[in-house]
Amino acid sequence: MNCWIALEKKAKALRDQASDALKIVRDQYQEQQSLLNRTQELAEQYQRKLAVLQTQPAHFGDVQLYRTSLKQLQHGMFQIQQEITRLEREVTIRQRELKRTEIERQKFEKLIERERDLDRAREELKETRALDEMSVQMHFRKQNLA
């Protein structure tokens, strides 16, 4: 039974590692999602400013600066979206790994429980045999006394 316990401990450690790795990737995903939201808000602000500048007489350099900045923000959003997509795939992979390690741990847990049940059954069988033996001896003693 000790081997099953050792294997279960190892499986628990692997499960905990997989869980930690999944948490890290999820945190990165949330961080990138937050960054994307902030970048989108900033791009929308620049878009509104650019629309206002184009309706009013403004310096061409200001308009050009907003256009350039807006393109850079759009390029940044594209890169962030690519990173989010990569992290989504990574989350899926980590979730599968966590599920696999949890199933492995549960397998060893069931083996340990089965081993304990067998030990209990063996112990009960020993007790039953001992009681049967005592009953037989008492029966013979009663017969010999009679």
Please place each PLM-identified region on the residue numbering.
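Charge-rich amphipathic alpha-helical interaction elements
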Residues: 1-146
